[in-house]
Amino acid sequence: MNPNYLDFEQPIADLEAKIQELRKASTGPAVNVETEVRALRDKLRVRTAQIFRDLSAWQVSQLARHPQRPYTLDYIDTICDEFQELAGDRAYADDKAIVGGLGRIDGRPVVIIGHQKGRDTKTKVARNFGMPRPEGYRKALRLMKLAERFRLPLLTFIDTPGAYPGIGAEERGQSEAIARNLLEMAELKIPVICTVIGEGGSGGALAIGVGDRTLMLEYGTYSVISPEGCASILWKDAAKAKDAAEQLGLTAKRLKGLGLVDKVIREPTGGAHRNPEQMGKRLKAVLLNELDALEKIPVDALLQQRYERLRSYGAYEGH
């Protein structure tokens, strides 16, 4: 199977392969297969729509982890007129699992922070598979305070399986670094927009996920634990990850219904990786619209709304 297709996309892969075969067969001057190709493309569109109309939580999880899915730097390239990356936490090291810096979107200055994964073995190792260490979160905090100092809106892009659980990370205060970011983000005197672009894994995601708006791409996930981890704990069997994904309620649709996500951004048919340019333009339009709304709110009112928003999480009514 083509590695760019997931298992549930096999019918799509088969139709794409047939189209390619016909294209190759049409190289001769006397061969015209356009009618057959058009028919197959129509069938492909219908079949793709059918498959993506009712995805399971596990299938959404697979899409969120797709190796070709756009990452933070890909979106920065698409939405920013210019961007200057800043490095280091000024205390220990520069964690490549988190990127951030100063940018302009349609001339508007912003600070952007996001998780960053790698594409190949070398960059995956360099980025630690998108799992930040304490110095990554402290770098993020440094940039947050920089944004506050210069009164620049903050945009964060969330895409991590979780914070790195290694011994060194724990020794350097992983839990403190995450907790500190939660505290500081709750009190930043600037507009903060957080967007889940892929995986939103537990505290590792939440450490750059406290803000005035939480956006989520259609096939992103946001959860306290991975489906595999949940299955291992509850049923002692990682093979039950599909069941765990359903129970966790980690999809954008479920989280929007619970009020944990403000807006779900529709992805191109087949996922963001099928048309990264289109996805970037959609994301840019939504971010600019949200910034326009937030920048009209006085700082005191913004902080009060953020406080009330955070206090509302977990509230329920008895029956």
From Swiss-Prot:
It is found in: Cytoplasm. Its EC number is 2.1.3.15. Coiled coil: none annotated. GO terms for molecular function: acetyl-CoA carboxylase activity; ATP binding; carboxyl- or carbamoyltransferase activity. It is an enzyme of class 2 (transferase). Acetyl-CoA carboxylase is a heterohexamer composed of biotin carboxyl carrier protein (AccB), biotin carboxylase (AccC) and two subunits each of ACCase subunit alpha (AccA) and ACCase subunit beta (AccD). Belongs to the AccA family. This is Acetyl-coenzyme A carboxylase carboxyl transferase subunit alpha. It comes from Xanthomonas euvesicatoria pv. vesicatoria (strain 85-10). The lineage of its organism: Bacteria, Pseudomonadati, Pseudomonadota, Gammaproteobacteria, Lysobacterales.
